[in-house]
Amino acid sequence: MRDMQMERDTRNIAIDKVGVKDIRYPIVVMDKNKDQQHTVARINMYVDLPHHFKGTHMSRFVEILNQYRGEITMRNMGELLQEMKNRLDASCAHLKMDFPYFIEKQAPVSKARSLMEYRCRLRGTLDKQKDFVLGVEVPLTALCPCSREISERGAHNQRSAVKVEVRMSKFIWIEDLISWIEECGSAPVYALLKREDEKAVTEQAYDNPMFVEDIVRAVTLKLKSAPEITWFRVECENFESIHNHSAYAMVEFPPRTEDAEPAPAP
């Protein structure tokens, strides 16, 4: 049967990334308390394509996922990327997995337990070297210092979305990374709060006002103190309660120089 993908292309244009995007597929994530957690990821898989090939073999990406069915984990991402390079005769392979991860949290006063969802990301690239990035998105509460200072009856607050991506010299638990970030807002966010908990969380936020700038700086100091983290990017978006826009701040460390390669795109 004719293989059109392997036919020669005469336009002399190499393609940096080609593959499949947004495949929903079950994966296994290492859980600090329960050994492992099963979840469903949205997966992107790409390879490079030399200028002389007309196309890549799209079906092989899905075949590779099926080959690793039930065994797709953080530990074997490098193996999966190598298989992509081998099967698709590529010099570079890219893999990104976005998935929900659940952690049981306890309310501060009632001690009521509930599952809190966090959006997580694993991203890997394999060419001559391996590059792996772990990302998490953590919701926080932020109370406006200016509003508290000038108001006689309370202060307005925001729900913050803190996005952190890190490169590591050794393994870091998702739970630990999330815990560090949750210490950096006015107050944490919970899935379940009773009245006594709402009172405690509200008062905690009021006693700990923070601008968006304060949050990214606090997270930056936390991550700088972790020797296993070799690079990170922190973004915080505060969804304003009295404005029709958001407040935003970002820190990348080490900072990128003008002639350096840009940080990997999400």
UniProtKB/Swiss-Prot annotation:
GO terms for biological process: tetrahydrofolate biosynthetic process. The keyword Hydrolase applies. Keywords: Hydrolase. Pathway: Cofactor biosynthesis; 7,8-dihydroneopterin triphosphate biosynthesis; 7,8-dihydroneopterin triphosphate from GTP: step 1/1. The keyword Hydrolase applies. Its EC number is 3.5.4.16. It comes from the Bacteria. It catalyses: GTP + H2O = 7,8-dihydroneopterin 3'-triphosphate + formate + H(+). Pfam families: GCHY-1 (PF02649). The record marks 144 as: May be catalytically important. InterPro entries: GTP_cyclohydrolase_FolE2 (IPR022838), GTP_cyclohydrolase_FolE2/MptA (IPR003801). GO terms for molecular function: GTP cyclohydrolase I activity. Signal peptide: none annotated. Converts GTP to 7,8-dihydroneopterin triphosphate. Belongs to the GTP cyclohydrolase IV family. This is GTP cyclohydrolase FolE2. The gene is folE2.
